[in-house]
Amino acid sequence: VPSMEGPFDYPYIFKKKVDQFGANTHIIHGEKEEKKLAALLKSPDYFAQEIIRGNTEYATHIIFKQGKILHSLNIKYIFHLEMGIKGKDESITRICHCPYLEIFSAILKSIGFEGVCCFNYKVRNNIPYIIEINPRFGGSLSRYFSVIV
């Protein structure tokens, strides 16, 4: 998981805890943005996080039951921007292999999760940095649902 302990070097990401499609996600490049978002920076509904640079992000959709992955689908997002925000910025999507299913399975097993979920993450030095885990049907799965079932 990218660091959530500030203060952060610029740029860093600032987002609403409960959100859809990055609508309330901001990349803070400096003091100018911090001043502009001063009220939100103090809100308990938001949090800041280290940004993982790169124009590629992944969403791994998983159906998990009895401690095992029954089905999974990995979607790769390639943004035109180095630090694109999924849902806000334009990207190209591709279905691809996920080499981190054992890690994701161990996480889900450790919290006793069963059901459908989605891991959103970026990769740095072959290590997945989990941006979020959505314990629900991920929005990006809808157009590929027939592939996973």
Roles of regions detected by a PLM:
Residues 1-54, 64-69, 94-101:
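Active-site nucleotide/adenylate-binding loops and adjacent lid/helix of ATP-dependent enzymes
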Residues 43-44, 111-113:
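Short secondary-structure junctions
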Residues 45, 59, 118:
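Short hydrophobic/aromatic beta-strand element in the GNAT-like acyltransferase core
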Residues 66-68, 123-127:
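A glycine-centered beta-loop-beta connector
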